[in-house]
């Protein structure tokens, strides 16, 4: 597809049985490359706080940071659908804040949709944002903004009661108007059941192969996050080794006086 993707295109992919590909991006260069590769959706995740800014979790990320990174992504003019995360405290306090901050991500950042975490309890928030004509992608299961309540990054929905609650959450957010939902850190059979029962696309991350699409953090698939690699991450490259080699070679050549040579100098 040579034209810009929309939420309608993403939803049609589920109906057609075509898998949806999603990656995070936080800047211009990565966005340009992944868009040239044909990625379907780009997520400016609040994971930027961890993999880009070095925070321990996503909670410190601010609206201003999200807008900054969204602008950087949008400048690459990707054909992929651009979705921006709503960070912690940008939508939990009241509906007015939620609408205002969703609007900022679209108006000031250039996002085409927003993503927020939570199930049935955020249905009214989703509805309020959608009523402003801003598309919303939901996010249930392991929700990183809830790590203190969950006791860390733990798989959700293993017990029957939890499983039913997540299924109810999925149906509630669909009814509220979400155009898609991220399923994170849940058993693959539960993800399969939710995917079958929803008419909107499910995007899995640590949720098995039966979701309508998959999302991963770009730094994870490139091997740039040496400190922590979840079970569900597959590395498709070793950028850490490539960067280490390039930087080490640069340092060595400068120290030896080999760089710059005449070919990299002006006469």
From Swiss-Prot:
Coiled coil: none annotated. GO terms for biological process: pantothenate biosynthetic process. 3-methyl-2-oxobutanoate binds at residues 46-47, 85, 115. Mg(2+) binds at residues 46, 85, 117. It comes from the Bacteria. Pathway: Cofactor biosynthesis; (R)-pantothenate biosynthesis; (R)-pantoate from 3-methyl-2-oxobutanoate: step 1/2. It is found in: Cytoplasm. Binds 1 Mg(2+) ion per subunit. Keywords: Cytoplasm, Magnesium, Metal-binding, Pantothenate biosynthesis, Transferase. One of its GO terms (cellular component) is cytoplasm. It catalyses: 3-methyl-2-oxobutanoate + (6R)-5,10-methylene-5,6,7,8-tetrahydrofolate + H2O = 2-dehydropantoate + (6S)-5,6,7,8-tetrahydrofolate. One of its GO terms (molecular function) is 3-methyl-2-oxobutanoate hydroxymethyltransferase activity. Homodecamer; pentamer of dimers. Belongs to the PanB family. This is 3-methyl-2-oxobutanoate hydroxymethyltransferase. It comes from Geobacter metallireducens (strain ATCC 53774 / DSM 7210 / GS-15).
